[in-house]
UniProtKB/Swiss-Prot annotation:
Chain's gene name: Mtnd4
Function: Core subunit of the mitochondrial membrane respiratory chain NADH dehydrogenase (Complex I) which catalyzes electron transfer from NADH through the respiratory chain, using ubiquinone as an electron acceptor. Essential for the catalytic activity and assembly of complex I.
TM region positions: 23-43, 60-80, 90-110, 113-133, 147-167, 194-214, 224-244, 257-277, 284-303, 308-330, 350-370, 392-412, 434-454
Protein name: NADH-ubiquinone oxidoreductase chain 4
A single GO BP: response to nicotine
Record-linked PANTHER family: NADH-UBIQUINONE OXIDOREDUCTASE CHAIN 4
Topological category with respect to the lipid bilayer: Multi-pass membrane protein
Entry EC number(s): 7.1.1.2
Primary location: mitochondrion
Pfam annotation, one family: Oxidored_q5_N
Amino acid sequence: MLKIILPSLMLLPLTWLSSPKKTWTNVTSYSFLISLTSLTLLWQTDENYKNFSNMFSSDPLSTPLIILTAWLLPLMLMASQNHLKKDNNVLQKLYISMLISLQILLIMTFSATELIMFYILFEATLIPTLIIITRWGNQTERLNAGIYFLFYTLIGSIPLLIALILIQNHVGTLNLMILSFTTHTLDASWSNNLLWLACMMAFLIKMPLYGVHLWLPKAHVEAPIAGSMILAAILLKLGSYGMIRISIILDPLTKYMAYPFILLSLWGMIMTSSICLRQTDLKSLIAYSSVSHMALVIASIMIQTPWSFMGATMLMIAHGLTSSLLFCLANSNYERIHSRTMIMARGLQMVFPLMATWWLMASLANLALPPSINLMGELFITMSLFSWSNFTIILMGINIIITGMYSMYMIITTQRGKLTNHMINLQPSHTRELTLMALHMIPLILLTTSPKLITGLTM
């Protein structure tokens, strides 16, 4: 574990000691090396925990998420270069330091063995994200978005802390490895139902569940590009990761407590997909599509069968790369036409034919078309939902149709049509941007060849 965390820590002095011209190059190239080093975690012969120390361990569920975190840091740095070049050198270095500290905290969160340690790190990721949104956001509403983000997360987290302390007193340990072997089960009572709610609510808000999702579109729309990327790709996955981990403890209760939440998430999936159809803001559309994809993950984690866990883990990784790619594309549009409104960006296919190809590929991946891993994740989830209740196939069908509709709407409004008159003096696509899109897309397609790497705990 130290071979990832220590080099990541050393990126901080590297950032501050590099000369202004070399800062971005140095940090990006070294963070790429770290992300390649993290791939060695995939060499696990079985599905047991791989202990690094008493504090840190990795297993088939946390490994793909750790690698995704390490993979996204260089991509975020590549995406942010253009948008930060007006800032002075100290601010640029501070921004890079925030991203690096966020990566370190996230890697430690995913590899923590103690639930209290996980909780502390889970909350600590809030601070750099909040600073990134409220300091480097584009519009003046960024403070409002930051406050929404902070309070939604904190309101969910306080009951979780109380619940974890209760479990510690009750069971005597919060170590995940020991908990998975304890035969301690919770009996059905009002207090235990409340304990279940307290444990799950923090993660459901983070996911986010439909109804407590209002912070997400706000935070996404106001965040700078790196903020949007890390929020969509990894911070939402903290919620689903926490839910899978804590479901060991709450075992028999989930069977009947999950019903309202599965129904709410399936209903929310259709509602948020429908909301996408009437968005005018490109980033907002991508944010709402994230909510509808994560609703599927919530439903599949709540069903608690091996297939549904596999589908949830696959869709988590697939959605992380896809939504991050879509935000990068939206940002490349924003840097040229200085507006997120979709109607202002008509006919871009005429000017940037290669970018239009990336738009098409990203939308098809978002639609879960083969050969992307989104398809596998959604197939696993659809099958496990269908075996849970036949009725869900109707909701899934409606959702697939609406997803197709908003993906078409997104492509047709931004890429097709007649060029608007205000588009003059547009910069061509940079190699940096095209490399960035490729580095998102290549893992998505290549993982199809060996999906067992990301199927999580049930290899």
